[in-house]
């Protein structure tokens, strides 16, 4: 039997809880850690956080503790890009898969630091674009070329206060028809 892929779940919101359940059900993966930011989740079993049976993986908010774990990959689910967290993860030799679509470090001043972190840790960073979901972005993008939109109904279950100004401008939030 091949070795299981060792996963750390970073953040434990709605999408992450689903990811934890998928990992628990997948015979080729093993959850080895869970990083939380809310004190009330610190020390709680990751399975319980995800609404399933305990997995024997205690969530922590201790950065040094989580980075010391032996893991192949970190599933990173922040509300926005957080380079101050990504750099130490990459330096520790863990590959990062993120639900953030906006990772484009070449266009950011932190690109050299990200590149150095990946080289030092022999790691990689991949943004999948699931945060908070592609479907609403497509509806908004499609409507941007229309001259007569009668209705678009989009429901999101996630606070949007942390969206970047670039994102808001890209989709025309707060603008008039002109």
Each predicted region: which residue ranges?
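A short hydrophobic/small-residue beta-strand
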Residues: 95-97
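Short, hinge-like loop/turn segments at secondary-structure boundaries
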Residues: 48-53, 113-117, 143-146, 169-172
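Rossmann-fold NAD(P)-binding glycine/threonine-rich loop
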Residues: 101-124
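N-terminal glycine-/serine-/threonine-rich beta1-alpha1-beta2 phosphate-ribose binding loop
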Residues: 1-92
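Short loop/edge segments at beta-strand edges and connector loops
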Residues: 61, 127-129
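Short beta->alpha connector loops at strand-helix junctions that form conserved
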Residues: 99-102, 129
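Conserved anion/nucleotide-ligand pocket segment
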Residues: 130, 135-178
């Amino acid at each position: 039997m091949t070795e299981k892929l060792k996963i750390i779940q970073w953040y434990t919101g709605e999408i992450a809880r689903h990811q934890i359940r998928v990992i628990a059900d997948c015979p080729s993966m093993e959850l080895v850690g869970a990083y939380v930011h809310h004190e009330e989740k610190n020390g709680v079993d990751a399975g319980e956080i995800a609404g399933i049976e305990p997995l024997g993986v205690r969530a922590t908010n201790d950065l040094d503790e989580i980075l010391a774990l032996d893991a192949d990959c970190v599933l990173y689910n922040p509300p926005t890009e957080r380079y101050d967290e990504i750099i130490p993860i990459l330096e520790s030799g863990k590959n990062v898969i993120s639900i953030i679509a906006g990772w484009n470090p070449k266009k950011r001043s932190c690109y050299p630091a990200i590149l150095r972190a990946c080289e030092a840790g022999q790691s990689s960073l991949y943004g999948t674009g699931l945060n908070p979901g592609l479907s609403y972005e497509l509806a908004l993008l499609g409507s941007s070329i229309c001259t007569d939109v009668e209705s678009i109904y989009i429901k999101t279950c996630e606070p949007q206060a942390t969206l970047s100004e670039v994102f808001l401008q890209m989709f025309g939030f707060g603008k008039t028809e002109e």
